[in-house]
UniProtKB/Swiss-Prot annotation:
This is Methylthioribose-1-phosphate isomerase. The keyword Amino-acid biosynthesis applies. GO terms for biological process: L-methionine salvage from methylthioadenosine. Signal peptide: none annotated. Its EC number is 5.3.1.23. It is an enzyme of class 5 (isomerase). It catalyses: 5-(methylsulfanyl)-alpha-D-ribose 1-phosphate = 5-(methylsulfanyl)-D-ribulose 1-phosphate. It comes from Xanthomonas axonopodis pv. citri (strain 306). InterPro entries: IF-2B-related (IPR000649), IF-M1Pi (IPR005251), IF_2B-like_C (IPR042529), Initiation_fac_2B_a/b/d (IPR011559), M1Pi_N (IPR027363), NagB/RpiA_transferase-like (IPR037171).
Length: 354
């Protein structure tokens, strides 16, 4: 069986959702996939904030990376003698970037990193923040590849897996979190079958995940979100593998809406449940999922598909885009720092501090 050192990254890691050109941030427009490969060029921090809010770029790690480059773009509009002075002038732009998606902790984490290096920088503060933005991206890619190996090692050869939303290269600097585990598991011949839920209402599973896997030559089977419990009952999957937008001190995990019901069904059917996310997603300052702000998006997103209305006029809709899975329904949280089995407050504190 191949180990992680023998993963063919040229095959399994060639999609990139973000490209810093030196002049602008170019984003692969994920709203148009899979039928059109187009890019959004962001020349300002406000353009980056709008791209994050409108889901042109999405996925917790990817929006954190985008925000870092957004700070670099905002710096072009100000003059300052040192980083501390620059930080005061940049704070409004940082606040606008942070408000673009409130649930994902990576966004606030990346902006805090930029604040920290700015506050300590001297006259070379522009170079300092550019290096930090690049470091955020580079560290994410390295973390994803390491998490892929750690997560794959938990999976018995011949297993079937189910994933939700999109947690691949499109959601990160590359390779992916949960999808990185799946890529590594396929390369190591541990995973025999991959299923992906469609993930209403934005269909990230149908539009993005199966498209990504197809690019890698991985045969993935798409299911309706409502078919997941029946799939688990059939015995075709042994693991549900998902990403995260925020992981609390007690292991409670916010992720794409529909994750919670997958965890409930998995526990009922004896299917293991794995969360894969970089340590930047861990928020030890938030005690439990009850304290997480859940983003509510336009109810109109539920009224149709692809711009075609499927719901009668006058209908109301409720559209939370994340839910919280209790830590006691999670078998393993995988980060680049290691695997936390049966996460709870004590195990999370041992791994990440208090």
């Amino acid at each position: 069986m191949n180990d992680s050192a023998h993963i063919d990254y040229a095959r399994y890691d060639h999609i990139r959702p973000l490209l810093w050109t030196g002049d602008a941030l170019e984003l692969l427009d994920q709203r148009k996939l899979p039928f059109e490969v187009a890019h959004v060029r962001c020349d300002s921090s406000d353009a980056v904030a709008e791209a994050i809010h409108s889901l042109a770029v999405r996925g917790a790690p990817a929006i954190g990376i985008a925000a870092g480059w957004g700070v670099v773009l905002a710096a072009r509009d100000i003059a300052a003698d040192d980083g501390s002075a620059a930080l005061q002038k940049l704070e409004p732009a940082l606040l606008r970037l942070n408000a673009a998606r409130p649930t994902a902790v990576n966004l606030a984490w990346a902006l805090m990193r930029m604040r920290r290096v700015l506050g300590a920088a001297g006259a070379d503060w522009r170079e300092v923040i550019a290096r930090e933005a690049q470091a955020i991206a580079d560290e994410d890619l390295a973390a994803n590849r390491h998490m892929g190996a750690l997560g794959a090692a938990l999976i018995a050869p011949g297993s079937g897996v189910l994933t939700h939303c999109n947690t691949g290269s499109l959601a990160t600097a590359g390779f992916g979190t949960a999808l990185g585990v799946i890529r590594a598991g396929m390369a190591q011949q541990r995973i025999a079958k991959v299923f992906a839920g469609e993930t209403r209402p934005w269909l990230q599973g149908a539009r993005l995940t199966v498209w990504e896997l197809h690019q890698d030559g991985i045969d993935a089977t798409l299911i309706a979100d409502s078919a997941a419990s029946h799939l688990m009952k059939s015995g075709l999957v042994q693991w549900v593998i998902v990403g995260a937008d925020r992981i609390c001190a007690n292991g409670d995990t916010a992720n794409k809406i529909g994750t919670y019901q997958l965890a409930i069904a998995a526990r009922h059917h004896g299917v293991k449940f794995m969360v894969v996310a970089p340590s930047s997603t861990v928020d030890m300052a938030t005690a439990s999922g009850d304290q997480i702000e859940i983003e509510q998006r336009d109810p109109g997103e539920l009224f149709g598909v692809g711009g075609v209305r499927t719901v009668a006029d006058g209908i109301h809709a409720w559209n939370p885009v994340f839910d919280v899975t209790p830590g006691d329904l999670i078998d393993a949280i995988v980060t680049e720092r290691g695997v936390i089995a049966q996460p709870d407050l004590a195990r999370m504190q041992a791994a990440f501090g208090s």
